[in-house]
Amino acid sequence: MFTNIVDFGLNVQEAVEAPRFCGSSFPQSPWPHRAYPNRVQVEARLSPAVIEALNARGHQVEVVGPWGIRNGFAPILVNPETGVYHGGADPRKESVMLGW
């Protein structure tokens, strides 16, 4: 999401709704700390060209449902110039963003 906001200029809601990927090369937190080098899950909404490019680079790509990456976020961004808060609610999980 950070890259979508900073590098691509998406607002917080657009960034949280964007197609997501999840790599498995880094060891997991729970015991026995499994790692799956070069394995990556991608949501089906990701461009087929990107999926092909990942495969061509040797990744083992698993395409999951259109909203299949199940880690949800409710991000908040604060504009340092105005002090205005911007939030997003992730459709992958039951979430809502409220402010007052």
Q: What does each model-identified segment do?
A:
Residues 48-100:
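In a subset of proteins, long, contiguous C-terminal domains/tails are tracked
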Residues 1-69:
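Proteins synthesized as precursors that undergo proteolytic processing into mature forms
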